[in-house]
Swiss-Prot record:
Source organism of the structure: Maricaulis maris (strain MCS10) (Caulobacter maris)
Pfam families: ASL_C2, Lyase_1
Protein name as it appears in the record: Argininosuccinate lyase
Compartments, record wording: Cytoplasm
Enzyme Commission code(s) on record: 4.3.2.1
The encoding gene: argH
């Protein structure tokens, strides 16, 4: 039995693409820990694209014949078709996507398949695949963020004139336009798009041709493969080309910030849909019920988006820990780079699709919003501004006067507008009847006409700008 096992191991070693130096194959546990195919097969398209570009370059530079290159390219497209059709025979024994594709290519075209890996290592191959995959992910996320923005802009246009309470410390602060509130998240999403665009720009350099770590003695044309694959340029240092993973960390950082930003609006949706707030509701498409309480209507989609940053930040922290302290150039530790990235991107994309859906689905309750906007003396700042503007008082004095009048209204249990003129004049004799024109939530909202302010005039201006930017 031992002899049979030894022979099997020897066969495994000799059949592996790296097996020439080995006389025995890996143990089953070694094979299990070493295999990454369950994860990195997601990069099959990128792997094939990279191999196609590499084969074209090898033929153009005379490293391989045009006939071999044509066979390789024909075979790779057949491999791609099999993968897309779900017919591809993935094998854990072949470790990863690169070995699986190459092994199947050899079955299809024979000896020319062995020429494909000339002037290339799995080190530069996987770095190329990973950059291509992340570039595609950045583009998908940008489109999803734009769809989320579009949903918000449409709601903002509809609700530009709707007054609602603005909050600080989750306490009623000043009245604002609901449209203005929603547009704030459009601005946030634009910064998220900028972060992904910046990350995409920095990752869009080609490591292909860096080989294992030192480059190659073959007369390759790295500019050609970089251009063929849509990269801006080849990476200038072969060690950096195979060792760098900061591009993945940067995308994960952008994803973490984006997820946190989404979670803030998700939390507001949760609050707004409670009976305590009563500002909005989600349709059945974005709600669930309870297994025991028949009356429940839960905003589970928003709650799950609120939770996603925990997983995505965890992915960032995990990869930072993997990369920390690694010496140049490649170490097998870097095989652990893709799982956290794929998970984080999956989570973020699902969160973005959910937030775009909920943003467009929200139905608001105008009466509840307007009533809440006028509570808790939200027009006190308007009273202070009136004292500055009409009575010429310094703002600090006006602040004290307004605070004293609020205290008087609190003692009587009435809003500011229900105090008598005489009561206000007991605090500041110069106040006259014109003060009542500023004492309402709607008047407060309408008066904030400064650039970036909450006046519906300014909100509609910003809506027009965003509709033009987004083409919606």
């Amino acid at each position: 039995m031992a002899d049979d096992t030894s022979n099997d191991a020897g066969q495994k070693a000799s059949s592996a693409m790296w097996g020439g130096r080995f006389s025995a194959g890996p143990s089953a546990v070694m094979e299990a820990i070493n295999a990454s195919i369950d994860i990195d097969q997601r990069m099959a398209d990128q792997d094939i694209d990279g191999s196609l570009a590499h084969s074209r370059m090898l033929a153009a530079t005379g490293v391989i014949s045009s006939a071999d290159a044509a066979a390789i390219q024909r075979g790779l497209e057949q491999v791609r078709s099999e993968i897309h059709a779900g017919d591809f025979p993935w094998s854990k024994a072949l470790e990863d996507v690169h070995m699986n594709v190459e092994a199947r290519l050899k079955e299809i075209i024979g000896e020319p398949a062995g020429r494909l890996h000339t002037a290339r290592s799995r080190n530069d191959q996987v770095a190329t695949d990973f950059r291509l995959w992340l570039r595609d992910a950045c583009d998908r996320i940008d489109a999803m963020l734009a769809a989320y923005q579009t949903a918000l802009v449409k709601q903002a246009e509809t609700h530009a004139d709707q007054v609602m309470p603005g909050f600080t410390h989750l306490q009623t602060a000043q009245p604002v336009s609901l449209g203005h509130h929603l547009l704030s998240y459009v601005e946030v999403a634009q910064r998220d798009r900028g972060r992904f665009a910046d990350a995409r720009k920095r990752l869009n350099e080609s490591p292909l041709g860096c080989a294992a770590l030192a480059g190659t003695a073959f007369p390759i044309d790295r500019e050609m493969t970089a251009s063929d694959l849509g990269f801006d340029r080849p990476m200038a240092n072969s060690l950096d080309g195979v060792a760098a993973r900061d591009f993945a960390l940067e995308v994960l950082s952008a994803a973490s910030i984006c997820a946190v930003n989404l979670s803030r609006f998700a939390e507001e949706i949760v609050l707004w849909c409670t009976r305590r707030f009563g500002f909005a509701t989600l349709s059945d498409a974005w709600s669930t019920g309870s297994s025991i309480m028949p009356q429940k209507r839960n905003p589970d989609a928003a709650e799950l988006v609120r939770a996603k940053p925990g997983r995505i930040i965890g992915s960032l922290t995990g990869l930072l820990t993997v990369v920390k302290g690694l010496p140049l150039a490649y170490s097998k530790d870097l095989q652990e780079d893709k799982a956290p990235v794929f998970q984080a991107i999956d989570d973020l994309e699902l969160a973005l699709l959910s937030m775009a859906g909920m943003a467009g689905d929200l139905s608001f309750f105008p009466e509840a919003l307007e009533e809440a906007a006028g509570e808790a003396y939200s027009d006190a700042t308007d009273l202070a501004d009136y004292v500055v503007r009409e009575l010429g008082k310094p703002f600090r004095d006006a602040h004290h006067i307004s605070g004293s009048i609020v205290k008087l209204a609190e003692a009587r249990g009435v809003p500011l507008a229900e105090l008598s003129l005489a009561e206000m004049q007991s605090v500041e004799p110069a106040i006259d009847e014109t003060v009542f024109s500023v004492l309402s939530a709607r008047a407060s909202m309408m008066s904030r006409t400064s650039f970036g302010g909450t006046s519906p005039i300014r909100v509609r201006e910003q809506v027009a700008i965003w509709k033009d930017r987004l083409g919606c």
